[in-house]
Design a protein with these regions (language model features):
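Aromatic- and charge-enriched surface segment that lines or borders ligand/interaction sites
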Residues: 45, 49-50, 70-81, 111-155, ...
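Extracytoplasmic/periplasmic beta-strand context in beta-sandwich domains
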Residues: 91, 140, 162-165
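Sec-dependent N-terminal signal peptides
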Residues: 4-13
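N-terminal lobe/hinge region of extracytoplasmic solute-binding protein
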Residues: 20-117, 147
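Surface-exposed binding/hinge segments that line
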Residues: 124, 158-203
Length: 203
Protein backbone atom coordinates (compact mmCIF):
# COMPACT_ATOMS: atom_id res chain seq x y z
CA UNK A 1 0.00 0.00 0.00
CA UNK A 2 2.84 2.39 0.88
CA UNK A 3 4.60 1.64 -2.41
CA UNK A 4 1.35 2.30 -4.31
CA UNK A 5 0.86 5.62 -2.50
CA UNK A 6 4.41 6.77 -3.29
CA UNK A 7 4.02 5.75 -6.93
CA UNK A 8 0.72 7.64 -7.15
CA UNK A 9 2.26 10.71 -5.51
CA UNK A 10 5.19 10.69 -7.95
CA UNK A 11 2.76 10.36 -10.87
CA UNK A 12 0.70 13.32 -9.62
CA UNK A 13 3.84 15.45 -9.19
CA UNK A 14 4.95 14.72 -12.75
CA UNK A 15 1.45 15.24 -14.14
CA UNK A 16 1.18 18.64 -12.47
CA UNK A 17 4.63 19.74 -13.59
CA UNK A 18 3.97 18.80 -17.21
CA UNK A 19 0.29 19.76 -17.38
CA UNK A 20 0.80 22.92 -19.47
CA UNK A 21 2.70 22.83 -22.76
CA UNK A 22 2.56 26.60 -23.37
CA UNK A 23 5.36 28.97 -22.42
CA UNK A 24 5.27 29.85 -18.73
CA UNK A 25 7.14 32.48 -16.71
CA UNK A 26 8.44 29.76 -14.39
CA UNK A 27 8.52 26.06 -13.59
CA UNK A 28 7.56 24.22 -10.40
CA UNK A 29 6.90 20.57 -9.62
CA UNK A 30 6.02 20.35 -5.91
CA UNK A 31 3.63 23.30 -5.72
CA UNK A 32 2.16 26.09 -7.80
CA UNK A 33 4.28 29.12 -8.64
CA UNK A 34 3.94 31.75 -5.92
CA UNK A 35 4.81 34.77 -8.05
CA UNK A 36 2.65 35.93 -10.99
CA UNK A 37 3.68 36.74 -14.52
CA UNK A 38 5.57 40.04 -14.63
CA UNK A 39 6.47 40.22 -10.92
CA UNK A 40 9.21 42.78 -10.25
CA UNK A 41 11.14 41.12 -7.44
CA UNK A 42 11.03 38.30 -4.90
CA UNK A 43 9.32 39.24 -1.63
CA UNK A 44 12.54 38.71 0.34
CA UNK A 45 14.44 41.21 -1.83
CA UNK A 46 14.61 44.88 -0.88
CA UNK A 47 14.59 46.84 -4.16
CA UNK A 48 15.55 50.01 -2.27
CA UNK A 49 18.70 48.53 -0.73
CA UNK A 50 21.87 50.62 -1.26
CA UNK A 51 23.75 49.78 -4.46
CA UNK A 52 27.51 49.59 -4.88
CA UNK A 53 30.28 48.91 -2.39
CA UNK A 54 32.62 45.95 -1.96
CA UNK A 55 31.51 42.33 -1.67
CA UNK A 56 33.91 39.93 0.03
CA UNK A 57 33.66 36.12 -0.06
CA UNK A 58 35.45 33.99 2.56
CA UNK A 59 37.64 31.29 1.03
CA UNK A 60 39.33 28.32 2.69
CA UNK A 61 42.68 27.48 1.15
CA UNK A 62 44.00 28.69 -2.18
CA UNK A 63 42.70 28.90 -5.72
CA UNK A 64 44.49 28.96 -9.05
CA UNK A 65 41.79 29.32 -11.69
CA UNK A 66 38.95 31.57 -12.85
CA UNK A 67 37.58 28.72 -14.96
CA UNK A 68 35.43 26.05 -13.22
CA UNK A 69 34.87 24.01 -16.39
CA UNK A 70 38.11 21.98 -16.88
CA UNK A 71 39.10 19.16 -14.56
CA UNK A 72 42.42 20.79 -13.69
CA UNK A 73 42.72 23.70 -11.28
CA UNK A 74 40.87 24.91 -8.21
CA UNK A 75 38.48 27.74 -9.14
CA UNK A 76 37.76 30.55 -6.73
CA UNK A 77 34.40 30.99 -5.01
CA UNK A 78 31.56 32.75 -6.77
CA UNK A 79 31.78 30.81 -10.05
CA UNK A 80 29.52 27.85 -9.35
CA UNK A 81 28.23 26.53 -12.69
CA UNK A 82 25.28 24.69 -11.08
CA UNK A 83 24.13 27.29 -8.56
CA UNK A 84 23.01 30.73 -9.82
CA UNK A 85 23.05 32.05 -6.24
CA UNK A 86 26.80 31.33 -6.05
CA UNK A 87 27.77 32.59 -9.50
CA UNK A 88 28.48 36.31 -9.56
CA UNK A 89 29.56 36.58 -13.21
CA UNK A 90 27.20 34.57 -15.42
CA UNK A 91 23.42 34.27 -15.38
CA UNK A 92 21.25 31.24 -16.11
CA UNK A 93 18.04 30.58 -18.03
CA UNK A 94 16.13 29.98 -14.77
CA UNK A 95 16.51 31.35 -11.25
CA UNK A 96 15.33 29.55 -8.13
CA UNK A 97 13.05 31.16 -5.57
CA UNK A 98 14.42 30.99 -2.02
CA UNK A 99 10.98 31.08 -0.39
CA UNK A 100 9.47 28.18 -2.37
CA UNK A 101 10.39 24.47 -2.27
CA UNK A 102 10.82 23.86 -6.01
CA UNK A 103 9.97 26.94 -8.05
CA UNK A 104 12.23 28.41 -10.73
CA UNK A 105 11.51 31.55 -12.71
CA UNK A 106 12.66 32.72 -16.14
CA UNK A 107 15.78 34.87 -15.93
CA UNK A 108 17.78 35.03 -19.17
CA UNK A 109 14.80 33.20 -20.60
CA UNK A 110 11.46 34.95 -20.81
CA UNK A 111 9.60 31.66 -20.91
CA UNK A 112 9.98 27.92 -20.35
CA UNK A 113 7.85 25.20 -21.92
CA UNK A 114 7.88 21.50 -21.01
CA UNK A 115 6.38 18.80 -23.24
CA UNK A 116 3.30 17.09 -21.75
CA UNK A 117 5.24 13.81 -21.66
CA UNK A 118 8.51 15.44 -20.57
CA UNK A 119 10.31 14.54 -23.81
CA UNK A 120 11.61 18.06 -24.39
CA UNK A 121 12.13 21.41 -22.67
CA UNK A 122 11.96 24.71 -24.59
CA UNK A 123 13.33 28.10 -23.64
CA UNK A 124 12.66 31.48 -25.21
CA UNK A 125 15.44 34.05 -24.69
CA UNK A 126 14.70 37.56 -23.44
CA UNK A 127 15.00 40.33 -26.03
CA UNK A 128 16.81 42.59 -23.57
CA UNK A 129 19.30 40.01 -22.24
CA UNK A 130 22.83 41.41 -22.54
CA UNK A 131 26.39 40.43 -21.73
CA UNK A 132 28.61 42.65 -19.60
CA UNK A 133 29.97 44.30 -22.77
CA UNK A 134 26.48 45.16 -24.01
CA UNK A 135 26.21 42.48 -26.70
CA UNK A 136 22.89 40.60 -26.84
CA UNK A 137 22.70 37.08 -25.42
CA UNK A 138 21.65 34.80 -28.26
CA UNK A 139 20.63 31.24 -29.03
CA UNK A 140 24.17 30.79 -30.40
CA UNK A 141 25.50 31.46 -26.90
CA UNK A 142 23.19 28.79 -25.46
CA UNK A 143 24.27 26.28 -28.13
CA UNK A 144 27.93 27.09 -27.49
CA UNK A 145 27.47 26.76 -23.73
CA UNK A 146 25.94 23.31 -23.83
CA UNK A 147 28.42 22.08 -26.45
CA UNK A 148 31.21 23.03 -24.05
CA UNK A 149 29.47 21.50 -21.05
CA UNK A 150 28.55 18.25 -22.83
CA UNK A 151 31.85 17.63 -24.66
CA UNK A 152 34.68 19.50 -22.94
CA UNK A 153 33.74 20.05 -19.29
CA UNK A 154 34.88 18.03 -16.30
CA UNK A 155 32.80 14.94 -15.38
CA UNK A 156 30.91 16.73 -12.58
CA UNK A 157 29.31 18.91 -15.29
CA UNK A 158 29.37 16.59 -18.29
CA UNK A 159 27.92 13.44 -16.69
CA UNK A 160 24.68 14.98 -15.30
CA UNK A 161 23.99 16.40 -18.76
CA UNK A 162 23.68 12.95 -20.26
CA UNK A 163 19.97 13.60 -19.70
CA UNK A 164 20.11 15.66 -22.93
CA UNK A 165 19.85 13.77 -26.21
CA UNK A 166 20.26 16.77 -28.52
CA UNK A 167 19.48 20.47 -28.97
CA UNK A 168 17.31 21.98 -31.68
CA UNK A 169 16.97 25.65 -32.62
CA UNK A 170 13.28 26.44 -33.14
CA UNK A 171 13.59 30.15 -33.92
CA UNK A 172 16.07 32.99 -33.50
CA UNK A 173 15.08 33.25 -29.83
CA UNK A 174 13.86 29.70 -29.09
CA UNK A 175 15.75 26.49 -28.36
CA UNK A 176 14.60 22.95 -27.58
CA UNK A 177 16.37 20.39 -25.41
CA UNK A 178 15.36 16.87 -26.41
CA UNK A 179 15.59 14.61 -23.36
CA UNK A 180 17.28 11.19 -23.38
CA UNK A 181 14.75 8.35 -23.20
CA UNK A 182 15.80 7.15 -19.75
CA UNK A 183 15.30 10.65 -18.28
CA UNK A 184 11.91 11.45 -19.83
CA UNK A 185 9.39 12.12 -17.06
CA UNK A 186 11.95 13.22 -14.46
CA UNK A 187 10.58 16.53 -13.06
CA UNK A 188 14.10 17.68 -12.11
CA UNK A 189 15.29 17.76 -15.74
CA UNK A 190 14.04 21.30 -16.63
CA UNK A 191 15.70 22.63 -13.49
CA UNK A 192 19.01 20.88 -14.14
CA UNK A 193 19.14 22.45 -17.60
CA UNK A 194 17.80 25.85 -16.58
CA UNK A 195 20.16 26.63 -13.69
CA UNK A 196 23.41 26.16 -15.63
CA UNK A 197 25.39 29.32 -16.28
CA UNK A 198 25.26 30.53 -19.89
CA UNK A 199 28.64 31.40 -21.41
CA UNK A 200 29.49 34.02 -24.09
CA UNK A 201 30.53 32.48 -27.41
CA UNK A 202 32.38 35.62 -28.48
CA UNK A 203 34.59 35.85 -25.40
Amino acid sequence: MKRFFLSLLFFLVISDAYSNSEYQHGYAFLSQLKYPQGFEHFSYVNPDAPKGGTFRIPEMGAWDSFNPIPLRGRPLSGLDIWDPVDNFIYDSLLEGSLDEPSSYYAKLAKGVRVAPDGSYVDFKIRDDARWHDGRPISIEDVLFTFDVYMTKANPSIRTPLEIIERLEVLDQDEIRFWIAEESIGDPIVPIRIGVLSILPKHY
